[in-house]
């Protein structure tokens, strides 16, 4: 039962990462938007869900005590709204400058979470967040299993919706903007509008992943907003296959599996004097996996599929 409980826990966390990776895939994989502030929008979603669903805190804002599903919707809306405000002045920036700008936004969000204690309680965090199905399940294992089913259902709904979107004319326009923004603009396509749309929608999915995380763990604090989260999501997308939604999901499961496995293996192999270096060594190992993947299979485990319009397929 312990192994099964851990497997369910592992898959829930991998699913939460998969939702964030799908959001990044929409931005970077399909549109070429270099968003290095993934963890910032994840944090906005997590705190929004905590405010909407959490108990009344005497020393902080929030405590509406609404159903977690309401929290998930609110997290997507608020994260998307923040992305819209951020994207208006920054989305025109080129790759390097946009990466710096989004990274700076993520750092600002973390600093706000750390220092605005009347709203976030600082490092004390927002606690006692409700988990869906916990009361009806009867046991922690059953509650986690029900949560896993819900996360898988959300992933399938999001993936099917994204697949339908990227196969549409709008999806082909995303690829056109990604490949050559200037040529797309010359053909009458509003590249700024397209990039802003995908930035908002992708950030909304990142906010949803934060909400799922907050209600699963029952706690959120600035410690959950570390830049390593963004690194993990990028590695997941590169390994799984940029531009492929199913590849994004596969990459999330594979990299999270390697991330957790390396911690167990390194803890067993390293001598006691080096146990404090397990986290650093693990990051190095995952970085080496990323480099190897870029050298040996840059298209990822599941490469991007060619998308041809029906009209083009009918031409001789």
Predicted regions and their residues:
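Transmembrane alpha-helices and adjacent helix-loop boundaries
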Residues: 1-316
């Amino acid at each position: 039962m312990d192994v099964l409980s851990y497997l369910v826990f592992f898959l829930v966390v991998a699913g939460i990462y998969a939702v964030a990776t799908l959001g990044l895939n929409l931005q970077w994989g399909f549109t070429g938007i270099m968003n290095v502030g993934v963890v910032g929008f994840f944090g906005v979603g997590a705190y929004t869900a905590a405010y909407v669903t959490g108990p009344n805190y005497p020393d902080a804002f929030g405590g509406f005590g609404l159903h977690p599903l309401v929290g998930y919707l609110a997290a997507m809306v608020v994260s998307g709204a923040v992305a819209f405000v951020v994207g208006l002045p920054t989305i025109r920036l080129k790759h390097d400058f946009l990466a710096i700008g989004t990274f700076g936004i993520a750092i600002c969000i973390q600093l706000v979470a750390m220092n605005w204690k009347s709203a976030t309680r600082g490092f004390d965090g927002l606690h006692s967040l409700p988990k869906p199905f916990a009361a009806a399940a009867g046991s922690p294992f059953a509650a986690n299993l029900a949560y896993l089913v819900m996360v898988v259902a959300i992933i399938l709904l999001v993936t099917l919706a994204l697949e339908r979107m990227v196969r549409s004319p709008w999806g082909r326009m995303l690829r056109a903007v990604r490949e050559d923004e200037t040529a797309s603009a010359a053909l009458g396509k509003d590249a700024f509008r397209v990039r802003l749309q995908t930035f908002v929608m992708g950030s909304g999915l990142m906010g949803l992943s934060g909400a799922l995380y907050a209600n699963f763990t029952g706690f959120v604090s600035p410690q959950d907003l570390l830049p390593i989260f963004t690194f993990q999501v990028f590695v997941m997308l590169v390994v799984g296959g940029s531009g492929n939604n199913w590849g994004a999901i596969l990459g999330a499961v594979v990299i999270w599996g390697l991330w957790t496995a390396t911690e167990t293996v390194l803890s067993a192999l390293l001598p006691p004097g080096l146990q404090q270096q397990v986290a650093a060594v693990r990051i190095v190992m995952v970085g080496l996996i990323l480099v190897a993947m870029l050298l040996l299979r840059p298209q990822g485990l599941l490469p991007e599929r060619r998308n041809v319009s029906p009209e083009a397929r009918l031409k001789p």
